[in-house]
Design a protein with these regions (language model features):
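A residue-level marker of the well-folded mature domains of exported/periplasmic proteins
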Residues: 1-361
Length: 361
């Protein structure tokens, strides 16, 4: 983009709690004379929004946040990527591996149980794990999934422990994750269990078990916010990058663990369908939902006689109360342009079992 090192200021190790984020944002705006400021952690949002209100001539952009739509602050913006697309594609690779294991007699169809290590029982995690499961199930219909939550975005010991429990206690034969350390991949390598990771390849930590990984690529968003700021053009209030915009990427497939040529061909086919809009990850015909309002299970959902979703009141404004129906044209519109960029799919669909829950706090 032609920026010099002096034009890019990076501040690290900013905690989510306390006033550190606000202080850093004010310093960047007031003292460093930055024109656009980007924060990358969910807990930074309230402090970044506070700074945005005080410096209206500076653009403030926040990854994974939920407040831009309702805050009404013109220089405050949220951004996310449709990582559920990448997780779905990675799930297809997992399903192909399960089919290989069934064909080789290593497991029966009923034993195609996926384990998933999640950080928190939040929409972001639930959306990702569900899209991964739906991808696997699209090619391995007998697949089911069990989930254990650690209560932390990054805790290698807890993540390894959760993955080990999924393998040993819950009889899971393939593991994936929405947690940030090498805990789950390490457990898989030690136990010889196939693994699909997240946020980058973990091949070096699991050469005998790693299959593929999906990740968010923020470069297209950085380019957009810089170019728009330079041109004096508006930055979208809610921006969502996709596979088509190269904002969602996948690693290479480990051909030592899964049939590489056929797997890559199938993944490319699915990516083409996503790009063409002929495949919707959360097509309501591809999953069923049990509603048990008494026990607060999917209470915001309405389903038909076949348990297919017909309406879902999602929490778009971030107040933990469903307010907007996001089901239309036969699919759940996750991270929709007219809603918000951050995920709001928090339905526990049939076929997925939470071994525990952890909402933080």
């Amino acid at each position: 983009m032609g920026l010099s090192d002096e034009q890019v200021v990076i501040v690290t190790n900013i905690p989510e709690t306390g006033s550190d984020c606000y202080d850093a944002a004010v310093d960047l705006a007031k003292n460093k004379k930055c024109n656009v400021i980007f924060a990358d952690s969910f807990g930074h949002e309230s402090n970044l929004l506070k700074a945005a209100k005080e410096y209206p001539d500076v653009q403030f952009c926040h990854a994974t946040g939920t407040s831009a739509k309702t805050a009404g602050v013109k220089n405050f913006h949220n951004a996310f990527a449709a990582i559920y697309e990448g997780r779905y594609v990675a799930g297809v690779a997992a399903g192909i591996k399960l089919n290989e294991m069934i064909k080789e007699g290593k497991i029966t169809a009923d034993q195609a149980v996926i384990g998933y290590v999640g950080a928190f029982t939040y929409a972001e995690v639930i959306s990702g794990m569900t899209s991964f499961y739906l991808g696997a199930k699209s090619v391995c219909p007998s697949a089911t999934m069990k989930v254990r939550y650690t209560g932390s975005w990054y805790d290698q010991a807890l993540e390894q422990e959760a993955a080990t429990s999924l393998i040993e206690q819950d009889k899971c034969v393939l593991i994936s994750q929405h947690a940030d350390s090498l805990g789950a991949p390490t457990a898989c390598e030690l136990k010889g269990v196939p693994n699909v990771s997240y946020n980058g390849s973990t091949y070096e930590a699991g050469k005998n078990t790693f299959i593929v990984s999906s990740a968010i690529n923020w470069a297209p968003y950085f380019q957009l916010i810089i170019e728009n700021t330079v041109k004096g053009e508006e930055i979208p209030t809610n921006w969502v990058g996709t596979i088509a915009t190269n904002s969602v990427v996948l690693s290479g497939v480990n051909q030592d663990v899964v049939d590489g040529e056929s797997t890559v061909a199938e993944l490319n086919k699915v990516i083409d369908q996503l790009n063409a809009g002929t495949l919707h990850v959360f097509d309501v015909n591809n999953f069923t939902v049990t509603v048990d309002a008494k026990n607060k299970l999917n209470a915001n959902a309405k389903v038909d006689e076949n348990k297919h979703l017909t309406e879902y009141m999602a929490d778009i404004d971030g107040d933990y109360v469903g307010d907007t129906n996001v089901v239309h044209d036969g699919y759940f519109d996750e991270s929709g342009d007219s809603f918000r960029s951050a995920p709001y799919f928090d339905i526990i669909i049939d076929g997925i079992t939470n071994i525990n829950t952890n909402y933080g706090g």
